[in-house]
């Protein structure tokens, strides 16, 4: 990636973060004017915290955006959201060959 592309990535990322108030815990990607949800993961429990990653497509910028979220609290009380990390991403697929060993009854 050359320096020119790096500046474009930074500018696009900055605009998306600013448009969705992602500099604070009051961010809002779910009701975006232009981001389209691609993959919205369920929250994963880890002690008192929960985590998830959501991937959106921005037709405005022609890029995919990953929003990594975390929150603490409880379903029965309030959730406290941390400032998310926001990254531009691309999907890469690979084929993995796997050998499975198992004992079977004769």
UniProtKB/Swiss-Prot annotation:
Domain of life of the organism encoding this protein: Viruses
Name this polypeptide is given: Uncharacterized 12.6 kDa protein in pin-nrdC intergenic region
Species, as recorded: Enterobacteria phage T4
